[in-house]
């Protein structure tokens, strides 16, 4: 065991004693320069292009940036346009306006009371109280559970009234109302009071509450597509066109006022809109292909229209213009993919942001070994299904990181920062420890995991001698004689 671990083991026997930073950016291992730039970019709202191989912390940096930006202050809604329904309006509400509306809506909910606290006539007419025996039950019960009589007697009683009441109750026919309106004296004037059924309770609405309801009903109907209380981090890796840019759902009734759904109700925001005032993270951005130009347009205009993407859909005729899309773009790619990033998009990032080359190794120092221990503790804590690791086992993980830096990156006396695969090795060792019933991941568990956790190409070479030999031996004789790629039409004659 190295000197570093001898000193450290005297104080901490395993990785459970290692404190995990609360700051998300401090959990990124070995990318100090990138972390500093990311903090500046978050504060100044600059774009980022992270370049490097998989597993070096690109997504962690992007996600951590969302903790350093202010909370969203705007909610985006689409409002019905009575004159031209296919062109809904955009409405932007500030946080203060949204909170005020919520308070107003809460004030229109009225007072919830127990049916026994309501006037007897109200409880009977709403179906809570049996008019014969006075027993209270659910308004969904047509027959009183206490006396087995219809809870509500029909208003017009003929010679066969009782018979009709019994038959109606037997078939679930109820005469109770959903709402009862009464008047009461309030000072020098009469006040209208409305009693409504509310599950097994009664909602009471006074005149002031009813007036607030009327004011709300006069407002144009709207739909919130980007709520105020949203996650400022939006992941759009591998997103389709509709997921990225939004869409308008199809209506089989063509938006018919009576049968269909109005256009504004079918509008769906895309990732560029959901990331408004937040971070839009796109890993492997070159996989978006031509969609990159739409990202560029949104970055330039800070708005992007929502329209139906399917020309065969009823939503194709609907368009919402100038939907806000003011986001911080954090794009990531591998070094080999740099030529495939749209040139104007990259220019836009450089003109209002930074390009960062991620490191793949760091010096093998005591300080960096401590960071490795932090990484091991983080991986175990995030997994939640494996035990912590002894210092002897952790030393093997660090030595494996040193070995990979030498083999992959040709760097001596350095530690690899391609940590995703090391995380897999830690989990494999943890699974072995769990299978054995160990309370901690021991040195032997890591040694066994290292033997198992090797690339499949290495296993193939060991088993078959070479990849070419493996390819040739994969198919049986019958498959070689009749292989799909060598078929011609005569095979079916």
Swiss-Prot record:
Pfam family, one: Mg_chelatase
Source taxon at top rank: Archaea
Sites where the protein binds ATP: 52-59
Root EC class: hydrolase
Gene3D superfamilies in alphabetical order: 1.10.8.60, P-loop containing nucleotide triphosphate hydrolases
EC number: 3.4.21.-
GO biological process, alphabetically ordered: proteolysis; regulation of DNA-templated transcription
A GO MF label: ATP binding
Matches recorded under InterPro entries: AAA+_ATPase, CbbQ/NirQ/NorQ/GpvN, Mg_chelatse_chII-like_cat_dom, P-loop_NTPase, Sigma_54_int
Keywords: ATP-binding, Hydrolase, Nucleotide-binding, Protease, Serine protease
Family classification: Belongs to the peptidase S16 family.
Protein name: Putative lon protease homolog
Source organism: Thermoplasma acidophilum (strain ATCC 25905 / DSM 1728 / JCM 9062 / NBRC 15155 / AMRC-C165)
């Amino acid at each position: 065991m190295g000197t570093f671990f001898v000193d450290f083991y005297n104080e901490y026997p395993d990785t459970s004693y290692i404190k995990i930073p609360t700051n998300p950016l401090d959990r990124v291992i070995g990318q100090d320069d990138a972390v500093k730039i990311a903090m500046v970019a978050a504060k100044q709202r600059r774009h980022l292009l992270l370049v490097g191989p998989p597993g070096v912390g690109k997504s962690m940096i992007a996600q951590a940036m969302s903790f350093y930006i202010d909370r969203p202050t705007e909610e985006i809604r689409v409002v019905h346009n009575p004159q031209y329904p296919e062109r809904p309006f955009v409405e932007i509400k500030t946080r203060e306006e949204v909170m005020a509306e919520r308070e107003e809506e809460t004030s229109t909910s009225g007072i919830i009371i127990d049916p026994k606290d309501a006037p007897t006539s109200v409880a009977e007419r709403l179906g809570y109280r049996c008019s014969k025996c006075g027993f209270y039950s659910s308004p969904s019960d047509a027959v009183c559970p206490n006396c087995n009589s219809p809870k509500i007697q029909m208003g017009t009683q003929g010679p066969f009234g009782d018979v009709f009441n019994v038959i109606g109750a037997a078939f679930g026919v109820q005469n109770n109302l959903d709402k009862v309106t009464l008047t009461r004296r309030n000072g020098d004037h009469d006040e209208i009071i409305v009693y409504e059924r509310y599950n097994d309770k009664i909602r009471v609405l006074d005149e002031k509450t009813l007036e607030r309801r009327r004011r709300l009903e006069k407002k144009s109907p709207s739909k919130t597509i980007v709520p105020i209380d949203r996650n400022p981090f939006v992941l759009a890796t591998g997103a389709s066109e509709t997921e990225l840019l939004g869409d308008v759902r199809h209506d089989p009734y063509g938006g018919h006022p009576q049968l269909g759904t109005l256009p504004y109700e079918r509008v769906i925001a895309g990732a560029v809109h959901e990331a408004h005032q937040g971070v839009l993270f796109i890993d492997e951005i070159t996989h978006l292909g031509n969609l990159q130009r739409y990202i560029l347009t949104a970055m330039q205009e800070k708005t992007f229209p929502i329209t139906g993407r399917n020309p065969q859909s009823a939503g194709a005729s609907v368009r919402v213009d100038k939907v806000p899309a003011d986001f911080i773009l954090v794009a990531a790619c591998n070094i080999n993919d740099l030529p495939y990033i749209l040139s104007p998009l990259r220019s836009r990032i450089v003109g209002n942001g930074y390009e960062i080359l991620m490191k793949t190794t760091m010096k093998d120092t005591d300080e960096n070994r401590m960071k490795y221990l932090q990484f091991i503790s983080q991986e175990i804590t995030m997994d939640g299904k494996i035990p912590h690791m002894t210092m002897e086992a952790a030393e093997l993980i660090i030595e494996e990181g040193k070995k990979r830096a030498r083999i992959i990156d040709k760097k001596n006396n350095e530690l690899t920062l391609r940590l995703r695969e090391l995380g897999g090795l830690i989990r494999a060792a943890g699974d072995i420890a769990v299978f054995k019933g160990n309370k901690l991941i021991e040195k032997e568990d890591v040694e066994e995991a290292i033997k198992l956790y090797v690339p499949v190409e290495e296993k193939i070479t060991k088993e078959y001698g070479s990849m070419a030999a493996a390819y040739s031996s994969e198919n049986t004789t019958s498959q070689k004689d009749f292989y799909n790629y060598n078929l011609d039409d005569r095979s079916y004659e």
